[in-house]
Amino acid sequence: MFRRAGAYGLLILLGSSAIWGADPQPYRVEIGSTKDSALNDTLKGTSELITLRKSAPVGPFGLIGRARGDLERLKAVLESFGYYQSNVSITIDTLPLDDPTLGDELTQRSRDQETQVNIAFNLGPLYHLGSIDIDGEVPPKAAASLQLTSGAPAVAADVVGAAERLRKALQDDGYAYARVDPPHARENAAERVLNVRFHVEAGERRPLGDIRIQGLQNLKESFVRRRLLVHSGDEYRASALEAARRDLLAQGVFSQVNVHIDPAPDPQGRVPVTFDIHERRPHVVGVTGAYSSDLGTSAGVNWTQRSVSGKGDALSLSASVINLGGGTATNGIGYDLSGKYRIPDWKTRDQSVQVSLGALRQSLDAYDQTAVTSGVSVIRKLSRIWSVSAGFTAEREKIVQESPPDPQESAAVGCTTQVAAPKPGTSEPRCTYHYTLLGLPLTAVYNTAGLESPLADARKGLRVSLAVTPTFSLGHPSAKFVITQLTGSAYFDLQHWGLASDPGRSVLAFRALGGLAAGATQFSLPPDQRFYAGGSGTIRGYRYQSVGPAFIPDGNPIGGTAINAGTVEFRQRIGTNLGFVTFVDAGNVSRTLNPLSGTLRMGAGAGVRYYTALGPLRVDLAVPLNRRRPPEVQRADDAFEVYIGLGQAF
């Protein structure tokens, strides 16, 4: 153990004090201050006179016993910070604890009379580290891991931590069975230093032996072995085993992965290793739901089968009813059906293939759409933070939208039918379009924010995605165009800037979106391929898709060929489960390739969060800052919009 010659301890002793007396003795505490804020905090957190004052009242003799216990506890704290000649004094109503009359004085008091407790410190000189020695053969690189310097303050936590660092360094250098004893420290009172010695038995460098895998139920062992980052014969490194453990957990099919080494090497001098694996449930059923004042209510169910073939592949099916409840930007109930099948490690490690099918029907102010979609994509993970994907998509859809104002343009873009019945809220004629779209999506993602799940609550990091999709529209109308979108979000923990006291509880978040559709005019682009703004994904406070070019005179959205949008959001947690946010969104949509040519719209608002195990439950209220009213538009922007869902807005 870490100690010096003589009788003193360096570890904080915790225990419960004896309690005597029937009536609690009320008291208040004044504790002296040192020049070290960390030491002050530790002293206050260790003193039971302070920490138990309200939660565990005591009688007069219990108070004396608690104070005597604090003498030893606080002395141990001071020594652990390097003050080995320090003293602690505690008085109760100016009487020292060894005063024989103290107990009688307290018992004769009225039960309502508060007692004054004072804690004072005499730190004495600060001890420093003297010699730092290692008993045993240790490689220079491992010895450097101690990170101790002669002359530095003799802080116990630093010395104990150095022993742990030395052990880890040896085990990461092939010494699987390295042993580092607790450091031994000897005081030199004359020079006010502690001389520290570490006793080490490193043993021999050893390779990995047999690697056993246990606990599998549905998964095939061959899948796990292909994923392993370590193999028999590799030099033993503790960090490599930990990396292999984390990699297996990241596959999403294991709930727990533990790694153990045998207590002794095998007859060949190797280190046998066991991966103890617990699989996640193979079947998962979930329900989803959301509400916004512009899109109404959506409700759905999803089902996932993990490891269909025992190789980590997954099949996911989902079905949702959307636009329930008459949102202000919708005109009827729709549906969204989808299925996805994903195969990990396709052809090579860290490369997956995903096949998807879907069906969608929705009726929006901008257009009515009925579509069947399909796609296949190959996702390649280049590193921990970089990934790329390439794929092929095919879509067959029918879209109904108001007719372009120019009749010749209307015919040129494939307006095959003039719909007799106008859309609710407008008397303008509408066109029916039939599209067959083939796309080649290419995507690159940089992610240090850890946003693997859409419900993740990011607190720091950056995520940037660039998507380029050449698209071919077959038949009539025919078109070729390329849609490019750059999206990004950044998260800054204000505690790192010294603007908050607790990590992860005060976060400043930013979101940005830019997009261009090149190669086709505004109306030759299929309506669902154009850009729109407004709603929770772009500019809160405005109806879904309502920002951008619009038909005259009814003001229904047309969509544009360029977009830019951005958000600044402050997130603050309160207590254990609650939080609030404030935000400002801004953006515009253009009918040309100049993303800045449209009218900038801004929205602002606030919301509350309730944090659950699945993610934060979100309720946001936003207002348009430059609200449009007649005669600028036929239909005014609503005074506010409400958004409810699971997960942060981004």
Named regions from a protein language model:
Residues 1-9:
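Bacterial N-terminal signal peptides that target proteins for export
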Residues 15-16:
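N-terminal signal peptide c-region/cleavage motif recognized by signal peptidases
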Residues 22-38, 51-293, 297, 314-335, ...:
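Periplasmic polypeptide-binding modules associated with outer-membrane biogenesis and secretion
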Residues 136, 604-623:
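A short, conserved beta-to-alpha structural element at the edge of catalytic cores
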Residues 139-141, 237-454, 462-465, 539-541, ...:
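Gram-negative/organellar outer-membrane beta-barrel architecture
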Residues 146-147, 225, 402, 593-595, ...:
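Short acidic, glycine/proline-rich loop/turn micro-motifs
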Residues 153-156, 214, 231-235, 247, ...:
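Hydrophobic alpha-helical scaffolding
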Residues 272-280, 287-304, 381-382, 390-391, ...:
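Extended beta-strand-rich architecture
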